[in-house]
Amino acid sequence: MSEKAVVVYSGGMDSFTVLNTAIQNGLDVYALSFNYGQKHSKELEVAAHVCRKLGISHKVVDITAINSLMANSSLTGDAEIPEGHYEDDNMKSTVVPNRNMVLLSMAIAYAVSLEAGKVYYGAHSGDHHIYPDCRPEFVEAMNAVSKIANYQSVEIVTPFLHSSKGEILKAGLDMNLNYANTWTCYNGREKSCGKCGACYERLEAFAEQGKTDPLEYEA
């Protein structure tokens, strides 16, 4: 019987690669997505489609009821999504307060209920500058907490914590993954904007690998 693992799966290219990495590692994967009121909720539709195709368990948890407690982010509020490079300081407006701690806490609870020993999520080096809850010290602290918060110890696994977006893409391409089955743009429109930090980072990754992004862009 395969070991169970929960994968925090947004529908973006990082978590898509993590999801498939866990599957390739022979784990019995339970994908977990969250609706926290993000403008780019299209990612949840993509996540559901991928999980149906893979035939794996997928839960989408609606936590919009606590949205007012996680306010002041351009991803969930009225502020415009900033344009520019993903390491520019204006991208700090896309930080959702305490998001990954909240999401990982629920993922750990789900893992305990499943008797799963691992929770995977897609933190990577490109997020370290802007997002405190994607940094190595955060992962280390969450791992320490997850080992003592319940009778069952759960390990937080971040396969790409020290990898760039380009390196994540290379790992996925080596697995023959189709990145048309992902959504990255922070704007929730029909096509990717090509101007937000998330789009910039994605396009840089494809350029770094000498590949063309299969998604359509407005610009």
UniProtKB/Swiss-Prot annotation:
Keywords tagged on the record: ATP-binding, Ligase, Metal-binding, Nucleotide-binding, Queuosine biosynthesis, Zinc
Binding site for ATP: 9-19
Cofactor note: Binds 1 zinc ion per subunit.
CDD domains in UniProt: QueC-like (cd01995)
Reactions performed catalytically: 7-carboxy-7-deazaguanine + NH4(+) + ATP = 7-cyano-7-deazaguanine + ADP + phosphate + H2O + H(+)
Keyword Metal-binding: yes
Gene3D superfamilies registered for this protein in UniProt: HUPs (3.40.50.620)
Name of the top EC class for this enzyme: ligase
Listed EC numbers: 6.3.4.20
A biological process from GO: queuosine biosynthetic process
CC cofactor: Zn(2+)
Binding annotation for Zn(2+): 185, 193, 196, 199
Pathway(s) annotated for this protein in UniProt: Purine metabolism; 7-cyano-7-deazaguanine biosynthesis
Gene Ontology molecular function terms on file: ATP binding; ligase activity, forming carbon-nitrogen bonds; zinc ion binding
Record has ATP-binding as a keyword: yes
Function: Catalyzes the ATP-dependent conversion of 7-carboxy-7-deazaguanine (CDG) to 7-cyano-7-deazaguanine (preQ(0)).
Family in the record: Belongs to the QueC family.
Protein name listed in UniProt: 7-cyano-7-deazaguanine synthase
Protein encoded by which gene: queC
